[in-house]
Amino acid sequence: MRASLSILVAFPALAAARDVVTIGMTGSWHPADVTEDNTKLLGTALSGSSFSKSVGDKRVCYSEVTSLETQVVAGTNYRFHISGCDVTDSDGECSTSALSSCELSGFVVQIFEQSWTNTLKVTNIKAEEAATASSSSTPAPTPASTSTSASSSEETMLQSSVQQRAMFSDFV
């Protein structure tokens, strides 16, 4: 009787936990709202000194953030779609002089943030056309090893479910 009562109590908790795992699943890109905070994050990253080697000497400034996508990994990847200028040195937002001497273009700026290690790094800067073509055929590189495949996502959910069941079995 006691065991069946424990199962009745644990089952709804497991069902709710499964929904949480599904909603917050790592690995896939999701549209996000452009906010003042994430726009400040973009400015801080572009004006900083932490750029991946793959970025090389490429620098951009932005006049507008047109859209944003995020990806949860061992931290957060941000994919900013911006209207901006190709520059030699960036302070984030385009200055008046930069805007007067360039033609605005679309760029995709990818940033990795890991708040608990104070990591903020620009990992990729591409022209919008090139970025659109490459992101549709090749998954974006991530600092942590994650997979966007369905089987990997299902495996992650299964592992979480098994861990949760093991946790609840201690109470039975």
From Swiss-Prot:
- Give a GO molecular function annotation for the protein: cysteine-type endopeptidase inhibitor activity
Q: Where is the signal peptide?
A: 1-17
Q: Where is this site: Reactive site?
A: 27
User: Which residue ranges are recorded for the region named Disordered?
Assistant: 129-172
Q: Where is the composition biased (Low complexity)?
A: 130-156
Asked if the Swiss-Prot or TrEMBL record annotates the protein with the keyword Signal, the reply is: yes
UniProt cross-references to CDD domains, sorted A to Z: CY
Give the induction annotation: Expressed during infection of host plant and non-sporulating growth, upon nitrogen starvation, in mating culture, in mycelium as well as in ungerminated sporangia.
Compositionally biased, Polar residues: which spans? Answer: 157-166
Location in or out of the cell: Secreted
Q: Which UniProt keywords apply?
A: Protease inhibitor, Secreted, Signal, Thiol protease inhibitor, Virulence
Choose one Gene Ontology CC annotation of this protein and give it: extracellular region
Motif Secondary area of contact extends across: 71-75
Q: Which family does it belong to?
A: Belongs to the cystatin family.
User: What is the role of this chain?
Assistant: Secreted effector that interacts with and inhibits host apoplastic pathogenesis-related papain-like cysteine proteases. Inhibition of host proteases by a pathogen extracellular protease inhibitor forms a specific type of defense-counterdefense mechanism between plants and microbial pathogens.
Report the protein name in the record: Cystatin-like cysteine protease inhibitor EPIC4
Q: Which gene encodes it?
A: EPIC4
